[in-house]
Curated annotation (Swiss-Prot):
Ligand binding (substrate): I25, Q26, G27, R40, S91
Residues bound to S-adenosyl-L-methionine: G93, S136, P137, K138
GO biological process: queuosine biosynthetic process
Binding note for cofactor: Binds 1 [4Fe-4S] cluster. The cluster is coordinated with 3 cysteines and an exchangeable S-adenosyl-L-methionine.
Membership in a protein family: Belongs to the radical SAM superfamily. 7-carboxy-7-deazaguanine synthase family.
Binding site for [4Fe-4S] cluster: C44, C48, C51
Task of the protein: Catalyzes the complex heterocyclic radical-mediated conversion of 6-carboxy-5,6,7,8-tetrahydropterin (CPH4) to 7-carboxy-7-deazaguanine (CDG), a step common to the biosynthetic pathways of all 7-deazapurine-containing compounds.
Organism for this UniProt entry: Agrobacterium fabrum (strain C58 / ATCC 33970)
InterPro entries to which the protein is assigned, alphabetical: 7-CO-7-deazaguanine_synth-like (IPR024924), Aldolase_TIM (IPR013785), Deazaguanine_synth (IPR017742), rSAM (IPR007197)
Protein name: 7-carboxy-7-deazaguanine synthase
Keywords: 4Fe-4S, Iron, Iron-sulfur, Lyase, Magnesium, Metal-binding, Queuosine biosynthesis, S-adenosyl-L-methionine
Record-listed Mg(2+) binding positions: T53
Gene Ontology molecular-function annotations: 4 iron, 4 sulfur cluster binding; carbon-nitrogen lyase activity; magnesium ion binding; S-adenosyl-L-methionine binding
Pathway(s) served: Purine metabolism; 7-cyano-7-deazaguanine biosynthesis
Amino acid sequence: MTEAARNIAARETTVRISEIFGPTIQGEGPLIGLPTVFVRTGGCDYRCSWCDTLHAVDSEYRDTWKPMSVEAIWQEVLGLSGGMPLTVSLSGGNPAIQPLGTLIAKGQGEGYRFALETQGSIAKDWFADLDHLVLSPKPPSSGMETDWQAFEDCLAAAGDGPQVALKVVIFDDADYAYAKAASARFPHLPVYLQPGNHTPPPPDDDDARVDIDGVMDRMLWLVEKISEDRWFSARVLPQLHVLLWGNKRGV
């Protein structure tokens, strides 16, 4: 696509946006600690029981999701980053619902990198253009069922383009067993285990209390589990932003 065509697409393509914020650090997964601007889209095809971003998921909050052109989104990213290239995290909800290919192309043309996390339920051809793709299938505690064919479709769509990682949120033994099975199914993917936050915020209260002690107890349990099982390829990482700021939004 020529630069002129990209500019036209940027003006004409509309994305539902829940919030854009940063720069801050990526709080979880393989890019943890990396300076990042977040573009959070609105809408999701899942309803996980412990979702911590219901304001970007529940259709009750649809009126707060702002339809924005790619050009308008990009101007916000540029303003937040001061025009200095960094990583842009595309999140949600499920960002795979939205038409993000034009945004990725525009940003990469200016030296920015793009990462996306999704549950792996919807494959898009523009996955191949990402720099990082984190596939985070939802374990039994979420109340959702995993469509492994759709997950494999996401891997196929990504091809050899982005660095791909597997991340699973863990609350209990059933989730742990699910993560081990998923890792065995896709042994070529680096795997990250994240202790679940059992005190996620209500969508209208980002100051809700977090049981940090409970989350850290779960993390210690996870460390002990992988050590006992000799699962030495797994990495256990917390949600760093939760440890720093609790359930506060926009950080």
